[in-house]
Every structure is written in C-alpha cells, then in structure tokens.
C-alpha cells in the first residue's frame, strides 16, 4: 500500500510532482486479517483540496486518487491483497499509475498476546504520472493495536522503500489512529500520518510530512467497511487539506 512516503529527496528531484497529490491509499491498518475464504473489495478515494504551501499553481494539486484493493483470506492468519492505483489529474485526464501485491500475517489469537499485531510486506510498480517511468517500490508495515473499553488505538511504524529510479531510499513514516466507539455503530477519532525522512537522515520538522485530522468509522453492517476523514497539513511540505473515503464490501463464507 502506498502511504505517506514522499520524502525530502523527492522534493528536491521532482518539486512539481512530489506533493501535487496525496498518496493513493491513506489508511491506518488494524491487526486482524480477513477471515479464511473471505474476500473484501475496497475503494480508496482521496482528493487534495490544497497542496503544499507556496505552490506556483495551487490548482496543480487538485488530484482525485482512486485505488481498488482486493484482499482474500487464505487462512485464519494470512491474507493476500492486490492494488490498482489510478488518478484523475487536474486537467481531467484519467491515468493508471501502477499495482502492488501485499501478503500479510497476523499473530494468532491462541497466542493470547495482550495486544494485536500483524506484519505486511507490499511490493510493486508505480509512477507519479503518465509522463514518468514506472519504478519498483514497496513498504514493510508492522501493525500494533489495542482495544480498551470503547477506545481503540493503532500504531503503524511504516517503512517504505524505492528500489529503482533517482529516489532510491529506505524511509520511515509512522502512522497512528485512535477511535472512540459509540453504541457499537459509530467510531469517531483522529488519524495521523507522517513521512520523517530516510534511515540515513531524519529531516527537520518543516521538511517532513505531518498530517492530522478527524475521522469517522461506520459499523452499519459486518459486510461493509466505511471510513472517512479530513486531514490538515502541519508543515509547509505537507498537503494542507485532503479528504479521504474508504468503502469496502466483504463477500464469501
């Protein structure tokens, strides 16, 4: 899954592209994998209302990203997902940007850990736009979460990597989510996304990406997954206003 991994090195090399649009999938993971023989189809949508500060052309940030994620459970603790990344550019052009695969394993409940934990490894090809070359990239995402009464907390200390192209790196961008559930129907809270730099160099605060905003989860039906939110950039190199929506549908028995 492509998450907030746009680092300072990308800013230097591709300043007009790096923060012209939000990432294609904006999500903090929970530790459980999908059940055995179940499949979930998820549409990740996000729109950048306002890009990084001081863009020469503010309208150049107005991308609508649409990503289809299909995940199947092959066991009680293992799933495999595939992603198809697309975008509608500010000029209205529809573009296919790439695809990833993502195996993930979770700690079995029989181990009786006091926290939930899982690990995903994502890999594939991606390009920022049709005028750019595809590059091989991916991420390693540990997931640690915990439910305490009506409160839920999840931490994803996400690590991304780029294997080809001028922006080869191994970066670090933790993500966090907390939710308070009301009558088991609605969850309200906030999500926080970062891109701090590479393992060779953590950037200064103003050079990093920090996005924070309110979110809502709807638990209307076990077959459906609905999550939405609005993110605000906390640094000049962050997109300043991004809206996100996730709609998922489970099928199978």
Regions from the PLM with identified roles:
Residues 20-253:
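Transmembrane beta-barrel domains of Gram-negative outer membranes and organellar outer membranes
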